[in-house]
Swiss-Prot record:
Native source organism of the sequence: Listeria monocytogenes serotype 4a (strain HCC23)
Pfam family membership, one: Aldedh
Record's catalysed reaction(s): L-glutamate 5-semialdehyde + phosphate + NADP(+) = L-glutamyl 5-phosphate + NADPH + H(+)
Annotated EC: 1.2.1.41
Pathway where this protein functions: Amino-acid biosynthesis; L-proline biosynthesis; L-glutamate 5-semialdehyde from L-glutamate: step 2/2
GO process annotations (BP): L-proline biosynthetic process
Compartments reported by the entry: Cytoplasm
The name this protein goes by in its record: Gamma-glutamyl phosphate reductase
Recorded family membership: Belongs to the gamma-glutamyl phosphate reductase family.
One GO cellular component, as annotated: cytoplasm
The encoding gene: proA
Length: 415
């Protein structure tokens, strides 16, 4: 708890400094950081290798190790991502609305930082940089608590970030890492209302549920991604295959990857064998309901838990449905309100799907893999929010701000 209080207090002070920083000052610091990350790539990769070796000894699945791994190419991507944040418009100070009331007061609504943001996340060291940069750009101080699997990578990255920001004239406490990765410290952080204005968990279902059950700090839930592809009877066969393979296989360990295929009974016998062939190239394990299992050559019988799980692996649950309505009911029952897709050339069915499915992102004839800040065209994101307050969907710079009312008068008093 001592580490949390010390760093929480320092973050509060840093937040006041950051709130006054100009866009030019912040962008200059971020450009310097981008260069410093590249300059320290060799050291960072050596520290990352410690985490990789430890994970391999534990028997961690390769798909999860991939999330942990840093390479020269990934460091270049991380460095470039920092530059892309520099290019984004700074929302701080933006006047979103202005008007006069009956008392002739001029009332303005402007964007301000949230203050101090806490982020608890798992084994993805790139998040250490992404979160630091996004919070910094929006004038927020941030306290990070990464998973134990990535502790050496995170400590090395944090050292580079803090040294770089300090050299640019900013407090080291603008961005801080909790090095104690124990569950007790994580739970203490969830109750750090005295210093944290908001807490954002990024990770699997267990982590997020733990935060929701224990936090007294306001939470923005970045949910798990039990994403579905529904292939309608009016779907184009090759389009359905291409989208399914991309959504499942391009990067199965991320939250916008597809986990369940729902397919209309009228096209199941024709489409499923071709889909199985395409997925076989990636050694995807299929877990099917009774009707789908009769059509597929190699599939395990699906359990109830398979409809609920976020596999984050080359595993796909498959179910044959009688109608689009049944698909929608299934998604709303088992989905995590993240990203859902329908493949159909029937306009009315597509409209019904997007109106009735409860999710942050609903796709018609496109892969769920586009639920991403960069892919959607508004830059880096802190996570994908699956709740409806304070933000929903990919959380970019604007979602890391609050608003303040500025009222100008010339002596008015209220009667």
């Amino acid at each position: 708890m001592t580490e949390l209080i010390k760093k929480g207090s320092a973050a509060k002070e840093a937040a006041q400094f950051l709130a006054q920083a100009t866009t030019k000052q912040k962008n200059t610091a971020l450009l310097n950081l981008s260069n410093d990350l590249l300059a320290h790539t060799s050291t960072l990769l050596k520290e990352n290798e410690k985490d990789i070796l430890r994970a391999q000894k534990k028997g961690t699945p390769e798909t999860m190790i991939d999330r942990l791994r840093l390479t020269e190419d990934r460091m270049k991507e991380i460095s470039e991502a920092v530059k892309q944040v520099v290019a984004l418009k700074d929302p701080i100070g933006e006047v979103t609305n202005m008007w006069k009331n009956e008392a002739e007061l001029t009332i303005g609504k402007t964007r301000v930082p949230l203050g101090v943001i806490g982020i608890i996340y798992e084994s993805r060291p790139n998040v250490t940089v992404d979160a630091s940069v996004l919070c910094f750009k929006t004038g927020n101080a941030v306290i990070l608590r990464g998973g134990s699997d990535a502790i050496d990578s995170n400590k090395a990255l944090m050292s580079v970030i803090q040294d770089s920001l300090e050299a640019s004239g900013f407090p080291r406490s603008s961005v801080q890492l909790i090095e104690d990765t124990s569950r007790e410290t994580a739970r203490d952080m969830m109750r750090l209302n005295r210093f944290l204005d908001v807490l954002i968990p990024r990770g699997g279902a267990r982590l997020i549920q733990t935060v929701l059950e224990n936090a007294t700090v306001p939470v923005i839930e970045t949910g798990t991604g039990n994403c579905h592809i529904y292939v309608d009877k009016a779907a184009e066969k090759q389009m359905a295959i291409d989208i399914l393979v991309n959504a499942k296989c391009s990067r199965p360990s991320v939250c916008n990857a597809a986990e369940t295929l729902l397919i209309h009974r009228d096209v199941a016998e024709d489409y499923l064998p071709a889909m199985e062939t395409a997925l076989k190239e990636y050694d995807v394990e299929l877990r099917a309901d009774e009707r789908a299992k009769e059509i597929l050559q190699e599939a395990k019988a699906a359990k109830e838990s398979d409809w609920e799980d976020e596999f984050l692996d080359f595993i796909l649950a498959v179910k044959v449905v009688d109608s689009a309505e049944e698909a929608i009911e299934h998604i709303n029952k088992y989905g995590t309100k993240h990203s859902e897709a329908i493949i159909s050339n029937d306009y009315a069915t597509g409209q019904a799907f997007h109106q009735k499915v409860d999710a942050a992102a609903v796709y018609i004839n496109a892969s769920t893999r586009f639920t991403d800040g960069f892919a959607m065209g508004f830059g880096a994101e802190i996570g994908i929010s699956t709740q409806k307050l304070h933000a929903r969907g990919p959380m970019g710079l604007t979602e890391l701000t609050s608003t303040k009312y500025i009222i100008f008068g010339d002596g008015q008093i209220r009667n």
